[in-house]
Amino acid sequence: MPRKTPIERYRNIGISAHIDAGKTTTTERILFYTGVTHKIGEVHDGAATMDWMEQEQERGITITSAATTAFWKGMAGNYPEHRINIIDTPGHVDFTIEVERSMRVLDGACMVYDSVGGVQPQSETVWRQANKYKVPRIAFVNKMDRVGADFFRVQRQIGDRLKGVAVPIQIPVGAEEHFQGVVDLVKMKAIFWDEENQGIKFEYRDIPPELAATAKEWHDKMVEAAAEANEELLDKYLGGETLTEEEIKHGIRVRTIANEIVPMLCGSAFKNKGVQAMLDAVIDYLPSPLDVPAITGHDEHDNEIERHPNDNDPFSALAFKIMTDPFVGQLIFFRVYSGVVNSGDTVYNAIKEKKERLGRILQMHANERKEIKEVYAGDIAAAVGLKEATTGDTLCDPNHVIILEKMIFPEPVISQAVEPKTKVDQEKMGIALNRLAQEDPSFRVQTDEESGQTIISGMGELHLEILVDRMKREFGVEATVGKPQVAYRETVRNKVEDVEGKFVKQSGGRGQYGHAVITLEPAPQGKGYEFVDAIKGGVIPREYIPAVDKGIQETLKAGVLAGYPVVDVKVTLTFGSYHDVDSNENAFRMAGSMAFKEAMRKARPVLLEPMMAVEVETPEDFMGNVMGDLSSRRGLVQGMEDIAGGGGKLVRAEVPLAEMFGYSTSLRSATQGRATYTMEFKHYAETPNNVAEAVINAKHK
């Protein structure tokens, strides 16, 4: 079956927003309008529109799926049909892993901002992740009908706080309760949507006279931004010629895809205004899979290879989310980068190095799931029947293996012991935790060897709370949770040279002999562990050098201070000796381990603790309480600013995670429940001596 929609008419987009910016309503409206036009396209007597509306009102469609497919022919029906795959992204900081994961498979994004709140803390996190994966974006300023709505303030904030170049391609007609529509700066016409039929109908009118000067000013700025796309447009613009609508759109498209500008639109999803024009902007300015660079990966021999977004290249795809569905079991959502795959085909999981049969393939539409036989380059779909796949795995053609860049997930910073309340819960808990860990790579489960307890680790207190809650709701497991524990690390501050480890054993028969001399020094933060082989003249035979490295790596798991993992160290193997008969891999593994332990003791070992970026939004009256409380928690206040719309103050601080337990309770009591906060992991920093001593002593008890 040939593909219905050519790949240049695909748009894989994410809609991301701060919690209250109205993302769900915006997404619902997109599904509503695309569903309506899709249905109208099929039924020519017009009746479909109405019943679809009733059903929509009755059910209030909300995406629960990770990816939904919609079709769009333009607000005025003037485009060939485009296929828009919408990937859902959560708005909460503890789940930035989800956002990161979806950014990896998007080609473009629509950032939704609240017209009053503007750019908020989480908007910054999402923006940084979009920068990391070079995702082109458009901005939609929602809730223009709210009291305090200010489109231009949000435009300034995108510049000041996010360092983005926001170029309005619309400006609002009115604001707050007088918000009526928008001025399309490309056409230089005002658009008014008809509220009677939920904004399906609209009309272009002349720009209201009181807005003419403002519209001209922003139109000129937009044209200038578009003209900078290439020499040809720039020459025409500088020569005083007028750019056509097509040229303006082309210029904006080129610069948006190059991540140089962010086109800005506005509306009120709730009042059915503006979302339709935003969908047109998705088609006009966001890239198709052909407009973004080809995906690169490595073959089995670690050579870099490319896969192009066409159906004739070998099949390659990335699994980006796992969901457990009550009807079909486990769903693996995947993005196809190249080639075609059919249900029933065998695919190769390049990370797990296993072949698996692809069972059914499903695609989610606005309000239904549809079973499909095949998916093509650029598609996003969900597979049933893959047992081995987890998030971040590459699925590919078994005869043309590629490993796409593995997703890098943050290390958890907090852990808790969890115990089932009854014997019956014991077995169910194991199954539940494994299922949850499969879905969420930033959540880890392990067993403490000393105590035998099950330890769960994640990105924050809220993250673990929600997972324990899901265990109860979805799997019926009651569990008690221990006190949260901080994931400390150890490292060294000094360089030490010529430290030796010698493992010699003579006890009748064949002995053991391994001898290694190392230099240990601090490595840059975030580097992890680096091993350099500087052996000259064969003083240690080649085949034993990996054993020394292995011995050191095993020792890194538990440092000399308090048994925490060791990070950011560089070890150079400089010298050693061997015995013709008694030397073996095990002896050199032991020698490496002994040398490292000894070197670490001498290199001024220190304890590191996770530092969190904390942002508190509080009414001004409680400012003193909040600051005092953060300082008492060894917090460093890094800045304060007014919250837009007279909503109090935003305090930014860096606070050790160890001091943040129970913070939500004490913040509630310090501010009568009127402040809110977010926190996310920033980096590891050296723990002050008095605190480190207490941690080390507690560990040795």
UniProtKB/Swiss-Prot annotation:
Gene Ontology molecular function, alphabetical: GTP binding; GTPase activity; guanosine tetraphosphate binding; translation elongation factor activity
Keywords tagged on the record: Cytoplasm, Elongation factor, GTP-binding, Nucleotide-binding, Protein biosynthesis
Family annotation (PROSITE patterns): G_TR_1, G_TR_2
Family recorded in the similarity comment: Belongs to the TRAFAC class translation factor GTPase superfamily. Classic translation factor GTPase family. EF-G/EF-2 subfamily.
GO cellular component: cytoplasm
Protein name per UniProt: Elongation factor G 1
Function of the protein: Catalyzes the GTP-dependent ribosomal translocation step during translation elongation. During this step, the ribosome changes from the pre-translocational (PRE) to the post-translocational (POST) state as the newly formed A-site-bound peptidyl-tRNA and P-site-bound deacylated tRNA move to the P and E sites, respectively. Catalyzes the coordinated movement of the two tRNA molecules, the mRNA and conformational changes in the ribosome.
Sections of the chain in a coiled coil: none
Organism (species): Paraburkholderia xenovorans (strain LB400)
Binding site for GTP: 17-24, 88-92, 142-145
Pfam families: EFG_C, EFG_III, EFG_IV, GTP_EFTU, GTP_EFTU_D2
GO terms under biological process: ribosome disassembly
